[in-house]
Amino acid sequence: FWGTLAKLALKAVPAVMGMIKKE
């Protein structure tokens, strides 16, 4: 469970950072 959660987090973080930089 935590392994999957970690993978999702690693994919989500760059996406969120990208959205913040665009704003």
UniProtKB/Swiss-Prot annotation:
Keywords: Antimicrobial, Membrane, Secreted, Target cell membrane, Target membrane. Its main location: secreted. GO terms for biological process: defense response to other organism. It is found in: Secreted; Target cell membrane. This is U1-poneritoxin-Da3b. The keyword Membrane applies. It comes from the Eukaryota. One of its GO terms (cellular component) is membrane. Expressed by the venom gland. Pfam families: Antimicrobial_4 (PF08024). Belongs to the non-disulfide-bridged peptide (NDBP) superfamily. Medium-length antimicrobial peptide (group 3) family. Ponericin-W subfamily.
